[in-house]
Amino acid sequence: MNKSNRIQTAELDWESIDGIEVPISKQFGDVYFSKDNGLLETRHVFLNGNDLSERLANLQDFEYFSVGETGFGTGLNILALWQLWQQVRPNNHSHLHAISVEKFPLSKADLIRALNVWDELKPLSKQLIEQYPLPLAGCHRLSFPEERFSIDLWLGDAQDIFPSMVKTKAVNAWFLDGFAPSCNPDMWEQNVLNNIVRLSNYGTTFASFSVAGVLKRGLKAHGIDISRPRGFGHKREMLKAIWKAPVSEEILFEPVSDTFHFTQQRIAIIGAGIAGLSTAWAFAQRGHQVTLFERTAPLSGASGNPLALLNPKLCPIEQSHEHLMTLSWQHALNFYKNFQAFRPIQIQQMALKNAQDLLDLTNQYPADIVTQQTSSLESDYPHIILTEAGAVSPHQLRDEILQHPGIELKIANITTLVSFENKVQLKSGNETTLEADHVVVCCARESAALFENYPLLKPIRGQVSWVDNSFATLPLHEAYSYGGYCMQLNTSELILGASFYPNRDDQEVLLDDHVHNFELIHSVFPHYAKQLPPVEQWQGRASVRAQSPDYFPVVGKMQNESRISTFAGLGSKGFLFAPLCSEVLVAQILGEAYPVPKSLLQKLDAQRFQKKVKPKKPYFKSQ
């Protein structure tokens, strides 16, 4: 990824033609869509050019069809694709996924203005605008499950992004867009085309308004058949292509599993903490049959606190495209807002150490995301305000997820997993409880009991406290982060957290931990802390988090061809990491597009510790 300070939004001029406002890029000196009629051009060039009406209408049950695009722009092509999907999609569980790249995204205000001219697309435009991402580099997944449609919008330079994409199932069709080659030559570089072909396969089609020599030569070099039918409006030609011929031996393709099937999968998930719940939801939303096993009760472990705070430690902005916490934060906000359990808030992050590094974020991130405002609580420490944050009620979220008709909860202690004939048997003692197509083990440190070699997860004791503060409540939409954290649990109680004791697995609520949590808030907000009742009157909950050796969650298959996966080691950021990591896990199992770059996928890989075995530093449980 190009080490720029931030994503630069598009600079636009506007030209009114027959009452239609046409945006023009100042960066590239070209229009975003045809002055004749951009929507009709999109249908002619990209939809008809890829024969999408017929192809989409004939998708099998549970088939996953993906369309790639080289320039998102105003989103017009994707909206036209979505509209076509509504018109022709079969009445089954097939899914349409779009992958688009944009170096200079429109601001939200400009996007609204640009799309306002297309009355027939307004119902779809509204949904797109609601999920339109913050202008931060990396992949932003927009999900519309009721439509069986999703978008991965990658912000950044195409020359950096396409090589970072990991191939699963091949992209089925491409919209080769992104301004004319004469205006934007970088988009049409051979490196970009090579990676577009790498992500494709025999049968993939390509369409473009451009018939420039650089594009034709680039595709022909890979054995792709090209035709030049009539273009739209005054344009004599357009490009239409299909990959039929064998590819050159010099092109190396990443191996793709042949085990992906267009059938409903029976998924068994062991463990009903936030990892298991979010994974169950991800599969069930795709129409698969999920059985969720829990030995005692859902949220009985570290996920069961009264409140979960989405409080990311943001990275320098040039690292945001592959920074797990930053990407997870954006994805989590988009995920949880669909639940009543979510409360949008802002977080005051105090600068206790390395203050300048934290304060510098206000010069890197957009001003409406990270600001320096006055505080509701008096403190001697500087701070920033993260305006896009949230709090989740875990038990309410659990109830909402378990209401999904595709999820069944069973209370059972699964002791053994046995693989056979493309199935996995789950056994409780000597009894077979279920046969599943895939199993995901989400049991934190106890996951190791179901694998031969499993990363050694460190126990970390933590205790949260809550206390009556009805005499001096804080705003419900604010939280405070200072090494610990505090915010309103409800209208009359303050919740404070959390103690942090590595290599301890005791779970008794201790007065010492209440004292610890009091001392944390007192060190930053002494005037307010002195008003709180004595710690002897506090309530609390203690639990044990599971932390991997390198602090990244453990996500995926422990063996390449296995039907048994794991998702554990989320540490103290379970509610932050879980929604995005569950999408990564589902992508691996079902062969869907990954919502993260290769560099981050490698850091999450469940097999990564198998390459790091050291005699003096064991990464695995002892046998």
From Swiss-Prot:
Keywords from the named record: Cytoplasm, FAD, Flavoprotein, Methyltransferase, Multifunctional enzyme, Oxidoreductase, S-adenosyl-L-methionine, Transferase, tRNA processing
Gene3D superfamilies, A to Z: D-Amino Acid Oxidase, subunit A, domain 2, FAD/NAD(P)-binding domain, Vaccinia Virus protein VP39
UniProt main location, coarse: cytoplasm
EC number: 2.1.1.61, 1.5.-.-
Gene Ontology cellular component list: cytoplasm
Residue ranges, annotated region (tRNA (mnm(5)s(2)U34)-methyltransferase): 1-244
Subcellular location: Cytoplasm
Cofactor: FAD
Domain of life according to the entry: Bacteria
Gene Ontology terms, MF aspect: flavin adenine dinucleotide binding; oxidoreductase activity, acting on the CH-NH group of donors; tRNA (5-methylaminomethyl-2-thiouridylate)(34)-methyltransferase activity
UniProt record, GO biological process: methylation; tRNA wobble base modification
Catalytic activity: 5-aminomethyl-2-thiouridine(34) in tRNA + S-adenosyl-L-methionine = 5-methylaminomethyl-2-thiouridine(34) in tRNA + S-adenosyl-L-homocysteine + H(+)
Segments for region (FAD-dependent cmnm(5)s(2)U34 oxidoreductase): 270-623
Free-text function comment from the UniProt entry: Catalyzes the last two steps in the biosynthesis of 5-methylaminomethyl-2-thiouridine (mnm(5)s(2)U) at the wobble position (U34) in tRNA. Catalyzes the FAD-dependent demodification of cmnm(5)s(2)U34 to nm(5)s(2)U34, followed by the transfer of a methyl group from S-adenosyl-L-methionine to nm(5)s(2)U34, to form mnm(5)s(2)U34.
PANTHER family attached to this UniProt entry: SARCOSINE DEHYDROGENASE-RELATED, TRNA 5-METHYLAMINOMETHYL-2-THIOURIDINE BIOSYNTHESIS BIFUNCTIONAL PROTEIN MNMC
Similarity annotation: In the N-terminal section; belongs to the methyltransferase superfamily. tRNA (mnm(5)s(2)U34)-methyltransferase family.
Protein name: tRNA 5-methylaminomethyl-2-thiouridine biosynthesis bifunctional protein MnmC
Gene: mnmC
